[in-house]
């Protein structure tokens, strides 16, 4: 057996913006959550359980953001997800009949029927609609470390115009984590990996020990880190920073050379929501008749061609095992080369969006399972580790200030501040200043005034979500993103004036409390 010379640390960022529409039974954007549960969260949980049952000692870290936790805990969304699964089972049964004369497609339609039926059984009967407890279980037995995030994924480098709004994002993030996991989080995934040194004092105040940064956040730190991204640094403010490894990231992330582009893998963009006859598929697409992804996909990537071949489950499995072996060999070689120049074992940090695994890269959760099993059983020079474990083992670190950075395109603030969305920020900053004004002027509010102030805090936080700015920049669901910003700023502003005029509209307040029911324990005084 080779001597262990280093470590690999996987960090998956599980996040969705808070989307909750009790006014509609079929709101298109709520399907983002249902797809993530079926394609990412349940497959990850199934593979974690499989590894534990097989006696495989593995380690993985996940950030679970407060909006995601709030949605997973929401009773209405839980019932809507069950209805979503029942609808998918109904469609899958129709597909089994429709494809009876095509053996290859029929096999896949049976596969989808089995998968959605299994999801329903697991979610309803085994998990009792409680995915959070399932993830907590794996943290409690020591194979998973869960870390927190900003309250609504607000982008700190721009919000810091009013630093109290960043403090509130961190405070509510930590508070939400404690509510669901019963302990203090040691790490935080800074939203969009957006780092500025000024936030260290607030991270420290709320007990955060470490952050994840983009590669250049470490490489351009001051002074230059001796070991680059292969060892964490600690800021003068006492916050440990782990930087993303370039090589392992490209192997998974790259749209050109990354593993998810393998020709045997499932083609994300070919879905019966677009391919099937319109009248046939209409009951299963958006209520306004717009074609959308259903999750039933029969083709593999095949190549750079419009003529796609049918998806073959065994071929995809073979590619997974080959690529897990390739990643394993690359990390083995990388650590062999690096370790000889270091006086402590290197750590290769591999952070990714959780939704890459399963949603975008359908085979991703099985790839993790295959890789973790290989690391445990095969002869290699590294082990899996969490950032917290590495800090505990190797507490001595170089002191350096990470560079201002993000993991957005070009590495800084441009995705969230550019000509497509710059008009939003004056409204966010004005609302932030007004929230601080309210907290200062009404320190002892009670009754309906207190409820209105707490709702103001919720509306501000929801408006600050970086997701809306990202969507506007990318030009995807732009109308929805703009509507969400307008709604939350509008609700905040209306409440602000009602509080100032001492004329709070109880019906209006009740309505938005039901719609924007995130963070029930929030205390507006965090903005003082």
Regions found by a protein language model. Name each.
Residues 2-59, 64-107, 223-528:
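Active-site and substrate-binding clefts of carbohydrate-active enzymes
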Residues 163-190, 330-342, 346-349:
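CE4/NodB-like, metal-dependent polysaccharide N-deacetylase domain
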Residues 63-68, 150-152, 187-196, 387-392:
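Short, solvent-exposed turn/loop segments enriched in Gly/Ser/Thr/Pro and often Arg
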Residues 185-195, 353-357, 477:
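Conserved short loop/turn motifs at secondary-structure junctions
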Residues 64, 190, 212-213, 352:
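Conserved beta-strand positions
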Residues 208-221, 385-386:
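His/Asp/Glu-enriched short active-site or ligand-binding loop at hydrolase and phosphoryl-transfer sites
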Residues 194, 199-208, 224:
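Hydrophobic, small-residue-rich alpha-helical packing segments that form membrane-like cores
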Residues 76-140, 146-160:
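Active-site-proximal, glycine-rich beta->alpha crossover segments in alpha/beta enzymes
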């Amino acid at each position: 057996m080779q001597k262990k010379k280093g470590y690999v640390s996987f960090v998956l960022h599980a996040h969705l913006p808070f989307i909750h529409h009790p006014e509609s039974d079929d709101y298109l954007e709520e399907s983002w959550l249902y797809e993530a549960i079926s394609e990412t969260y349940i497959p990850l949980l199934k593979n974690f359980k499989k590894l534990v049952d097989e006696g495989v000692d593995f380690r993985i870290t996940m950030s679970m953001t407060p909006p995601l936790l709030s949605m997973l805990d929401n009773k209405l969304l839980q019932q809507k997800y069950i209805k979503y699964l029942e609808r998918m089972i109904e469609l899958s049964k129709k597909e089994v009949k429709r494809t009876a004369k095509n053996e290859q497609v029929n096999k896949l339609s049976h596969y989808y029927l089995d998968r959605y039926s299994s999801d329903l059984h697991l979610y309803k009967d085994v998990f009792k609609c409680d995915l959070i407890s399932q993830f907590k279980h794996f943290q409690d037995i020591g194979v998973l470390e869960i870390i927190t995030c900003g309250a609504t994924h607000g982008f700190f480098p721009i919000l810091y115009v009013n630093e109290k709004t960043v403090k509130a994002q961190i405070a509510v993030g930590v508070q939400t984590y404690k509510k669901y996991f019963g302990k203090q989080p040691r790490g935080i995934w800074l939203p969009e990996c957006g780092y500025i040194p000024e936030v260290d004092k607030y991270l420290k105040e709320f007990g955060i020990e470490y952050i994840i940064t983009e590669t250049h956040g470490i490489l351009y730190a001051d002074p230059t880190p001796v070991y680059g991204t292969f060892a964490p640094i600690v800021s003068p403010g006492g916050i440990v920073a782990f930087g993303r490894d370039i090589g392992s990231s490209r192997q998974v992330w790259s749209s050109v050379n990354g593993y998810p582009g393998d020709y045997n893998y499932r083609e994300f963009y070919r879905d019966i929501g677009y391919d099937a006859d319109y009248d046939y598929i209409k009951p299963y697409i958006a209520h306004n008749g717009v074609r959308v992804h259903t999750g039933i996909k029969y083709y593999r990537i095949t190549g750079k061609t419009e003529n796609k071949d049918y998806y073959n489950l065994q071929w995809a499995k073979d590619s997974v095992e080959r690529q897990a072996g390739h990643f394993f060999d690359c990390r083995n070689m990388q650590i062999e080369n690096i370790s000889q120049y270091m006086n402590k074992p290197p750590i290769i940090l591999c952070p990714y969006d959780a939704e890459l695994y399963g949603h975008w890269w359908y085979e991703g959760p099985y790839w993790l399972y295959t890789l973790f099993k290989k690391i445990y059983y095969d002869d290699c020079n590294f082990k899996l580790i969490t950032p917290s474990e590495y800090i505990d083992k190797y507490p001595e670190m170089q002191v350096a200030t990470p560079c201002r950075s993000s993991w957005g395109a070009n590495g800084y603030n441009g995705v969230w501040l550019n000509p497509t969305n710059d008009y939003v920020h004056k409204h966010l900053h004005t609302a932030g200043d007004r929230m601080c004004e309210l907290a200062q002027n009404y320190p002892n509010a009670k009754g309906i005034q207190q409820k209105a102030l707490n709702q103001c805090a919720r509306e501000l936080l929801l408006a600050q979500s970086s997701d809306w700015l990202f969507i506007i920049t990318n030009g995807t669901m732009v109308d929805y993103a703009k509507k969400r910003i307008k709604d939350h700023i509008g609700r905040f502003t209306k409440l602000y004036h009602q509080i100032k005029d001492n004329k709070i509209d109880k019906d209006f307040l009740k309505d938005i409390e039901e719609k924007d029911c995130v963070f029930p324990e929030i205390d507006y005084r965090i903005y003082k």
